[in-house]
Amino acid sequence: MKGKFSIVLHTHLPFCLGKGRWPFGEEWLFETVFDTYLPLLKVLNELVEEGKRFKIVVGLTPVLLEQLKSYYFKEKFLEYLDQKEELGKKDLVHFKGNPTYTKLTEYYLREIEDIRNLFVSLNEDIVSGFISLERKGFVELITSAATHAYLPLLKNDLSREVEVKSGVIIHKNWTGTSPSGFWLPECGYKPGVEEILKENGIKYFILDAHSLVEGREVIMEYGRRLPKLKIPDESKTFLPYEIKDDLYVFLRNPSTSEQVWSRDFGYPGDGVYREFHKKFEVSGFQYWKITDKNVPLGEKEIYNVDEAREKAKVHAHHFVSLLKEKLSSFYRESGVEGIILSAYDTELFGHWWYEGPLWLKEVLSLISEDKDIDSVSPSDFIKTGVRRKGLFRESSWGLGGFHYTWYNSETSWMWDMIHEDEDEFKSLFHELSGKEGSLLLKEFLLELSSDWPFLVTTSQAKDYGKERFLEHRRKFLNIVEFLKGIKRETVDLDKIETEDFIFKDLMIEDLRR
């Protein structure tokens, strides 16, 4: 054995059920479940059935867990599948007489049926599918901040503590286990966060490689685009760092992450893979391949499933050989077995990169048969006792490695409001109780979601991001007024609770224990 490999999949979507349908809203979740979560469960279960030995880490954010477990999601997702199937049947009529397109439509219709059957076989409970794999030893589930708040920019430690502790509580409520690992939203780190993680029983978290402090530290300016932080010598990512007693930092390996993440330089940009951006006007089905990244959408060639599958296997072999080469080199130089940790947004696999789940299955299968490398979780590697010491800078995995993606000229007004509301929440925290206090907590957490400034900055759904932020802030302030005896007759707590139906079992009293 020359080393270990750990793949970490960060799985998150903001609270979107009942908050619009298309193009912005709950269809985000339905699409990602169809494209990614269920295909991922499918390939992992296939590996188990084939007798492969493997381990991966799946992070499920608490806000996503709550949505996947809701009756609303289960009902609406089945409706989504029915609608998708009906649109596919219309494609069959449209493409009648064109066997190339008809064959692909039939393939997609079978895929819909397979996904429906898998969902039903899980009793419409995707979370239980991951829990089952964890209990069998193939998956390690980790948690995150309750609503994926961007922790470094929060004003008060109490806000960070509430996000972290709520996340751990919700994870325990749904999985029955205490999480060992914690995904800092956007890998956003600020010195001192580790104290909060340790207080909540966390054993490890993950940062981008450039977070490691080397030499003189540079003071960053908030709100400006800055040159990308320098990535250290890659060998410094091959062992974890003990940041506090029994709390470890694992660094994302830069080159293996880029090899998979990048559409321009990585595997997903290969011309034979399915083109994400071109969709048929009737169904939204994707019938074309990338062909070449410089080819206009109107000139894309027809997608070939078999060709793409073969290329995914080729890329899996290349990736495993890359892992072995890097781990062997580190072993020769250091005399110890290292670990390569590669972390990605889960939706890359299937949603953005259609062939991603197949590639992942092939990678884990190849590693299972290889004597020089083993797939493990960070928890497994910690038990080896091999570690380093290190310091880490305020950072993220966002643009430039700092905070610009969430804090800039377009979003600074959001943070002014957030900081005001943090102070309000802090002033009330020790007096809050019962339904009203727990409802205030919920709206506070939803206001803190990092997704709202992200959507504004990236222009993916700028107006939607602003509206959602202001919606939850308005509800937070209304509940504050209710608690203070102001306008009590105009604040409908039941309506707020119905509209924002997650976190029903999260009690404000639990956070003070």
Predicted ranges, named:
Residues K2-R53, L60-E106, R110, Y222-R513:
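Active-site and substrate-binding clefts of carbohydrate-active enzymes
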Residues P179-Y189, D345-F349, A461:
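Conserved short loop/turn motifs at secondary-structure junctions
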Residues G59-L64, A145, G181-K190, H210, ...:
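Short, solvent-exposed turn/loop segments enriched in Gly/Ser/Thr/Pro and often Arg
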Residues N45-R53, E124-I142, K198, F330-S334:
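Acidic (Asp/Glu)-rich catalytic clusters
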Residues F95-S180:
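Well-ordered mid-protein domain cores that form the structural environment of catalytic cofactors
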Residues G188, V193-I202:
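Hydrophobic, small-residue-rich alpha-helical packing segments that form membrane-like cores
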Residues Y150, K203-G215, D374-S377:
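His/Asp/Glu-enriched short active-site or ligand-binding loop at hydrolase and phosphoryl-transfer sites
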